[in-house]
Amino acid sequence: DLHNALWVLYKRMSEAQSFTNPMKYLLMRDWPLLKRYEAEMCRRFDAVTAVSEEDKAALIEAGAPSDMTVIPIAVDLDSQPYIERQPKGPHIIHIGTMYWPANINAINWFLDAIYPLIKARLPEVRCTLIGARPPESIIERAKADPSLTVTGYVDDPLPYLQDASMMIVPLKAGGGMRVKILNALAQGIPMVTTTV
């Protein structure tokens, strides 16, 4: 079982970094190594599954056997009941691990490029970022902007989902299946995401 082709994520993350960011060069060094490693791991097993056709193709490109099976991630609708939402005005939420570099990059891009455009049209908009271990840089942004809230980890996101007008997944780099998108759609939460 492979959750996703991780080398693709590292490659996309390297492409999303600016040339002045040292992380770009670490990722540029690491993704080809990871690509070879993932192919080698796939060759060691009699059967391998991937979560999407895209991941299967990426693993085959890396050198994995082509007889891989795709088993898409599914959402149990009984365990993800529809949520009756009653937002108190326009409210955007993001749920995701806030120490994962792809999520940090996504949130910074959203706050720099997209959120100001939304605020210009909807000055009363609120944005709540939910997820464990947010970096200090994002916490500082929230201190400077009263419309932005950073919660850190929450035991139960239900109150935030009930108050959400929409959920965002603004990834600029990623791989595999974004399960949170499936969960939110099953729960009736409007979703805006990038094409990654």
Regions found by a protein language model. Name each.
Residues 1-2, 51, 71, 130, ...:
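Generic beta-sheet signal
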Residues 1-36, 97:
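Acceptor-binding helix/loop patch of EC 2.4 sugar-transfer enzymes
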Residues 2, 133, 170-172, 188, ...:
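Nucleotide-sugar donor-binding loop of glycosyltransferases
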Residues 7, 27-82:
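Donor nucleotide-sugar binding/catalytic pocket of nucleotide-sugar-dependent glycosyltransferases
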